[in-house]
Curated annotation (Swiss-Prot):
Organism: Xerocomus spadiceus
Assembly behavior: Homodimer.
Source organism, top-level taxon: Eukaryota
An individual GO BP term: positive regulation of cell division
Keywords in alphabetical order: Hemagglutinin, Lectin, Mitogen
Gene Ontology MF, one: carbohydrate binding
Protein name: Inulin-specific lectin
Purpose of the protein: Inulin-specific lectin. Has hemagglutinating activity towards rabbit erythrocytes. Has mitogenic activity towards murine splenocytes.
Signal peptide location: none
Lineage: Eukaryota, Fungi, Dikarya, Basidiomycota, Agaricomycotina
Amino acid sequence: CSKGGVGRGYGIG
C-alpha cells in the first residue's frame, strides 16, 4: 500500500 499526501494509507498495490 502507498501513503497518501495527506498522510493516509491507500490500499493500492
